[in-house]
Amino acid sequence: MEVERVQDISSSSLLTEAIPLEFIRSEKEQPAITTFRGPTPAIPVVDLSDPDEESVRRAVVKASEEWGLFQVVNHGIPTELIRRLQDVGRKFFELPSSEKESVAKPEDSKDIEGYGTKLQKDPEGKKAWVDHLFHRIWPPSCVNYRFWPKNPPEYREVNEEYAVHVKKLSETLLGILSDGLGLKRDALKEGLGGEMAEYMMKINYYPPCPRPDLALGVPAHTDLSGITLLVPNEVPGLQVFKDDHWFDAEYIPSAVIVHIGDQILRLSNGRYKNVLHRTTVDKEKTRMSWPVFLEPPREKIVGPLPELTGDDNPPKFKPFAFKDYSYRKLNKLPLD
């Protein structure tokens, strides 16, 4: 069965200035109604080049406890490499449909790798205004080049180079977060599977939408991952839920945005917060983003670290193998 891509729906919708009913969100979700219009709190910024390591640790821990979200600058990923990553990703989505479909997620696949549109079950049967491409970029034993675009030709080289940098940055951040819990610096890395932890690249492609007041690029969710490292293009759209409001997230162009995901929430026994976020769309411009999700291997059981629990602080979460946790969450099944 042929899947209709949002990129194609966008092209026809722009002519009529209307969108199909399945993309129109209920009033409790519509951005025009639910976005806070007052003063917006600034997303915490952490400068990783600051020689005062204690100051960096405090900033990361505070942001992770209060927001579950922060942005890092002077993070070590070359600006030119990020530009190239975004360039090859944009060129892929500008290819003819037949070329994009050559790396599509197979219909019977239980994995998420590949070009696609629908990701998870929506309780109201609504659709998100986004197409995506998923593929693992690390470790090499988990990489399946079947889902890496052949065009543009430099796609593979750029993504392999980016994988090295993003792994290094994520391990730096996990070390700081472990330190903030009073644990050995490799505690959270090991809790996520150590060197077998997987890095999943996702490209989100949000084409222009004639009714951005009614639709969402991605509905409200927390990430399945341990942490997520994201670089967006220049079109805003990330919204964060904090203090009972949806706020537009304003970020520094050269920064990497860090989301604390479900697995760090669980490993830290709730000390670090998993950020609830969503994505809005633009009437005239295409928004894109490149999150990399650091995830445990499928069979890895993740639950509160024993060092963080005791009689006075019992475990708040039930341990799950990551594959079971992912299945239950994506299918809206109970997690307790």
From Swiss-Prot:
Changing H132Y: Slightly decreases activity. Pfam families: 2OG-FeII_Oxy, DIOX_N. Changing F134A: Reduces activity 7-fold. Changing H221W: Loss of activity. Transmembrane segments: none annotated. Binds 1 ascorbate molecule per subunit. Its main location: cytoplasm. Its cofactor is L-ascorbate; Fe(2+). 2-oxoglutarate binds at N204, Y205, Y206, R287, M288, S289. Changing H277F: Loss of activity. Changing S289T: Reduces activity 2-fold. This is Flavonol synthase/flavanone 3-hydroxylase. The lineage of its organism: Eukaryota, Viridiplantae, Streptophyta, Embryophyta, Tracheophyta.
